[in-house]
């Protein structure tokens, strides 16, 4: 999201409210939700799942994103049209640490495939994970939104239908702050992004 979604939203927000001081925090869903609940953050853009289901939260869905198998460009799987994940039982995988939505989604997909992956490394940021995949250290399950930046070094292969998984990405904020003018500007910008994304 820090590659495309967030920069687009922030540039639009700065046009609306140039005086706004924006600070970004890159972290797991779990950590960001906790900080939002404690009012340490005004709003978060995250994968919408059980961590974001809270009566205190207002949610604005923005877009959906498929999960893919990410492989090095030279991988023997790089030319596959789609992949049956159960064929990769003996392969080495890399994952994000617990608390990240993509980690949780990966667990669900591996369970559907009937195996626990051999995990060589768990990292706490997606950029390190992608870098490791591009270096051939292992494979990963990653959202399609990373492809725009890493298409020269990482190939994203669709999962066969039985393993298909989508992440719903959205803006989450506290209902108690929904009248804040800065937050209203952010909501408007996220709505604009969502409507442009669907075109």
For every predicted segment, state its role.
Residues 9-18, 103-116:
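Ligand-binding cleft/hinge of the Venus flytrap
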Residues 54-60, 65-66, 127-175:
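Beta-alpha-beta core module
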Residues 20-27, 116-125:
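Short beta-strand-to-loop elements that line the ligand-binding cleft
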Residues 15-17, 104, 144-151, 162-199:
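C-terminal effector-binding regulatory domain of bacterial HTH transcription factors
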Residues 8-12, 30-67, 71, 134, ...:
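Short beta-strand-centered segments that line the small-molecule binding cleft or hinge
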Residues 77-78, 91-113, 179-187, 197:
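Secondary-structure junction motif
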Residues 56-67, 71-93:
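Flexible hinge/capping segments at coil-to-helix
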Residues 1-17, 21-25, 30-33, 178-181:
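N-terminal winged-helix
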């Amino acid at each position: 999201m820090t590659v495309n979604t967030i920069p687009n939203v922030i540039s639009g927000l700065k046009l609306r409210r140039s005086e706004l001081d924006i600070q970004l925090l890159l972290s797991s869903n779990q950590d960001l939700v906790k900080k939002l609940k404690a009012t340490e953050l005004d709003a978060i853009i995250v994968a919408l799942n059980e961590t974001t289901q809270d009566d205190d939260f207002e949610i604005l869905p923005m877009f959906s994103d498929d999960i893919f198998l990410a492989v090095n460009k030279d991988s023997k799987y790089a030319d596959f049209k789609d992949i049956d994940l159960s064929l990769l039982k003996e392969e080495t995988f890399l994952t994000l640490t617990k608390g990240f939505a993509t980690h949780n989604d990966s667990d669900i997909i591996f369970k559907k495939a009937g195996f626990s992956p051999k995990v060589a490394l768990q990292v706490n940021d997606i950029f390190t994970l992608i870098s490791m995949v591009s270096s051939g250290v292992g494979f990963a399950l990653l959202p399609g939104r990373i492809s725009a930046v890493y298409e020269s070094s990482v190939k994203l292969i669709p999962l066969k239908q039985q393993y298909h998984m989508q992440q719903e990405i959205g803006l989450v904020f506290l209902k108690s702050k929904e009248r804040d003018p800065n937050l209203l500007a952010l909501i408007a910008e996220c709505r604009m992004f969502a409507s442009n994304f669907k075109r």
